[in-house]
Amino acid sequence: MNFETIIGLEVHVELNTNSKIFSPSSAHFGEDPNASTNVIDWSFPGVLPVMNKGVIDAGIKAALALNMSIHQHMHFDRKNYFYPDNPKAYQISQFDEPIGYNGWIDITLEDGSTKKIRIERAHLEEDAGKNTHGTDGYSYVDLNRQGVPLIEIVSEADMRSPEEAYAYLTALKEIIQYTGISDVKMEEGSMRVDANISLRPYGQEAFGTKTELKNLNSFSNVRKGLEFEVERQAKILRSGGVIRQETRRYDEASKGTILMRVKEGAADYRYFPEPDLPLFEIDDAWIEDMRAELPRFPAERRASYIKDLGLSAYDAGQLTATKALSDFFEQAVALGGDAKQVSNWLQGEVAQFLNAEGKTIDQLALTPDSLVEMIAIIADGTISSKIAKKVFVHLAKHGGSARAYVEKAGLVQISDPAVLIPIIHQVFADNEAAVADFKSGKRNADKAFTGFLMKATKGQANPQVAQQLLAQELQKLLD
């Protein structure tokens, strides 16, 4: 029997506000344990939450970016549960009136086609603290993360394979990153994914019993965990077994999933409206103000790069991987840079430099105008492509004008025959054995002279001019 895979994803995104959702404590990552806390985060008796308007701004932007309707009469709810990293014994979240609902995004499949994935809801809430279990037998609670603003984005169960889930996460991350509301760094916990997966026989309408997957710390692990679950559940069903409603975690060492707990039923969090916060009215003007701050999103940019600039779908996809990279590219083209040349540099030398240095493009001293200028002086013969790589490294580290640096560093390409011919003659004089080989008929010996000449000019000889002049002067040796 063959089974259809049903996948839905819950994605928690930390919002990059300066302060927490209901307290003035810093929301920045990486502080010493409990350094970013105050009486609200510790839930001292009598303290009251104060709404951070920036969180609602971010929620509106997310809802708009994900094609969602917005609840314009919005409130918060208490989600009641006890855990050591939750000192209030409840979480302030949203239940029946999330900020966004009924949305969708398009994903690109492996064959190049697109598929619409529906999004059920996006709700705002506060993050919980973090428990650390020490080797000394004690458990420690760090409340720096307590109260950091989150938006939880819950998809419909529209994905039919681990590959579709991977494509959805990739598209979702791009969109959220473009809005500027989060840096979506999974390694820092600012994007976290839980997956729900079930199987059903093809043709059956009812969903099967779902398994929830946690500990998915990368998109790759999401895909691997789901692939393992497809095989695990299919094997159980084919043998006549029954799938239990479980929470499992992905284990990188075994490349499989491990049981965490069996769910007896749906959790009862006893939601009720948060009495310490008012109803929030989101009027049309507020929504339009947030819409005006949104950029062009990746899909629109990719289509423009392909249609208007003649780039390939692959190049367009690479250039829109981050908003900073896409903005840099568009600025360079607006300054007169050839789109294909700019694209080649960004995907080649620039990408290699960024990977080696562990930086992002907005951390470079290189500017779009200096890259365009460098491409121009390659085209007009001022420098060779080889020298350009050296120039690029300087610009990436120090910035400035490409032409000014080339002139100051003496890197201008030598194209004048009056300068090159005497150097060629000196090369002949310094390499008599190679000249003798050439004269004796070893025609491949002429290739060695190119290397001798480039060495003598420290790589500054114009390759095309140098080849022509070498051929001319070598012929004279035979005449």
Curated annotation (Swiss-Prot):
It is an enzyme of class 6 (ligase). SUPFAM superfamilies: GatB/YqeY motif, Glutamine synthetase/guanido kinase. InterPro entries: Asn/Gln-tRNA_amidoTrfase_suB/E (IPR017959), Asn/Gln-tRNA_Trfase_suB/E_cat (IPR006075), Asn/Gln_amidotransferase (IPR018027), Asn/Gln_tRNA_amidoTrase-B-like (IPR003789), GatB (IPR004413), GatB_C_1 (IPR042114), GatB_Yqey_C_2 (IPR023168), Gln-tRNA_amidoTrfase_suB_CS (IPR017958). Pfam families: GatB_N, GatB_Yqey. The keyword Ligase applies. Heterotrimer of A, B and C subunits. Allows the formation of correctly charged Asn-tRNA(Asn) or Gln-tRNA(Gln) through the transamidation of misacylated Asp-tRNA(Asn) or Glu-tRNA(Gln) in organisms which lack either or both of asparaginyl-tRNA or glutaminyl-tRNA synthetases. The reaction takes place in the presence of glutamine and ATP through an activated phospho-Asp-tRNA(Asn) or phospho-Glu-tRNA(Gln). This is Aspartyl/glutamyl-tRNA(Asn/Gln) amidotransferase subunit B. The gene is gatB.
